[in-house]
Amino acid sequence: MFNQAAQELTTIRDVLRFAVSRFNEAGLFFGHGTDNAHDEAVYLILHTLNLPLDMLAPYLDAKLLEAEKEEVLAVIERRAVEHIPAAYLTHQAWQGEFDFYVDERVIVPRSFIYELLGDGLRPWIEYDELVHNALDLCTGSGCLAIQMAHHYPDAQIDAVDVSLDALEVAGINIEDYGLEERIQLIHTDLFEGLEGTYDLIVSNPPYVDAESVGALPEEYLHEPELALGSGADGLDATRQILLNAAKFLNPKGVLLVEIGHNRDVLEAAYPELPFTWLETSGGDGFVFLLTREQLLGEE
């Protein structure tokens, strides 16, 4: 099929149609940036051809050079056959207006937390200038640390990960955004060895339960398992965060954690904690907020 496509397809429109059919035939999972075969194909084609990602229409009937067609079809075939997430093929992932370098040393950024930084944390953080020190636990690619630096211009940020490989990727992104003086990368397991206190702690920790890890679509198998699974019920990392966070929060400090689909399990495990569930594009059951006072049972 690949050789036939290389011979008969001539325009971007042709290649796009072929890619959508190929992706549907392959039964791909979409959830690392796009949610359907068409958008995934558009992204891969435009990126590979170095065209603006938001300008498909003017180029649909443009004819491809043989070398261009060969390169685009090779990317399409890798996506279809190997089920590699598109972000790993392009080494680029987007969150809002921010783009980040990614490879298979880190999960593809998809946390809802970035939607909440700034206005989404009012009234708990009334003014962005009140955040002077922030912590990103399980930083991965560094995407949340970088976005915190953007929203909180006076903040110094510690970005922590247990994976040295992940910290290398985070370092690439921090350098790309010129934030080396504001974001400190720390190799440790959650709070271990940390000495500072923070106005804001955010974390998108591993939260997939053991049964679900075994049933994940093939695309997720390209991501580091260390960043996905978290014990039998998916809460091992979250338990450690809840146990220790208060010691590292300033008096008016706020904790923000994403936990996937584990809201019911978490609330059953911690009936005494008054979780505030924040609305995101995914719904109101994925990210919780707790203040230091709530963690200490003082509110």
Swiss-Prot record:
For the keyword Transcription, the answer is no
The catalytic activity of this protein is classed by the Enzyme Commission as: 2.1.1.298
Q: Which domain of life is it from?
A: Bacteria
Could you list the residue ranges that cross the membrane? none
Which principal EC class is assigned to this enzyme? transferase
* Gene Ontology molecular function, alphabetical: nucleic acid binding; protein-glutamine N-methyltransferase activity
UniProt catalytic activity: L-glutaminyl-[ribosomal protein uL3] + S-adenosyl-L-methionine = N(5)-methyl-L-glutaminyl-[ribosomal protein uL3] + S-adenosyl-L-homocysteine + H(+)
Instruction: Write down the Pfam families for this protein, in alphabetical order.
Output: MTS
GO cellular component terms, A-Z: cytosol
Q: Check the record and name the NCBIfam families matching this protein.
A: hemK_fam, L3_gln_methyl
Q: What does this protein do?
A: Methylates large ribosomal subunit protein uL3 on a specific glutamine residue.
Tell me the protein's name.
Answer: Ribosomal protein uL3 glutamine methyltransferase
To which species is this protein native?
Neisseria gonorrhoeae (strain ATCC 700825 / FA 1090)
